Amino acid sequence: AMANILKGTVNPSGHTPDIYARTLRNDPSYVNFSDFKYDNSASLDSYAASTYFVEYEEGIYIGYRYHETAAKEAAKGNYAGYDYDKAVVYPFGYGLSYTTYSHEYAETPTYDSATQTYNFKVKVTNTGNKAGMGVAQIYVNVPWQQGQVEKAHVVLGGFAKTKELAPGASDTVNVEIKRDYFTSYDYT
């Protein structure tokens, strides 16, 4: 399969499932990974693996959620020194193809109160000169205020792939996002 992609007989349509950072040394979680060991674990000495730990401090800011939020905060002047273009090599949802696509809403997004689902009909057009399958991605941006439940700047809400499109052809796909996906919880 990989040979067919490299030869161009098959057009890839996958997208990155995570962000590819230039270096993990600039990621805030980097300092949390080491050979940390509990120093008061005499009762656990027979379970050597249990005496080691990794400090988890990132909360919701993992992978692309950290980088997208950091870029937004840097643009507002709240994160000095952060440069998205220098930190990220391939963003979340990035995909390579031997063709190009345009995306537009086929109609105004709707909400179905019976299923509590938002529906986004997206028209994807193959604007290149090779057949391929396009992907429509919808990202969610839920605003938050300081002191409220934290939210990442953007989160992938949903996606849908088209059928194979000849050059110039279009397909309309429906991306559904459940209302619960927008919900915030505070357990304090």
What are the roles of these predicted feature ranges?
Residues 1-133, 141, 188:
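Secreted, periplasmic, or luminal enzymes acting at the cell surface/secretory milieu
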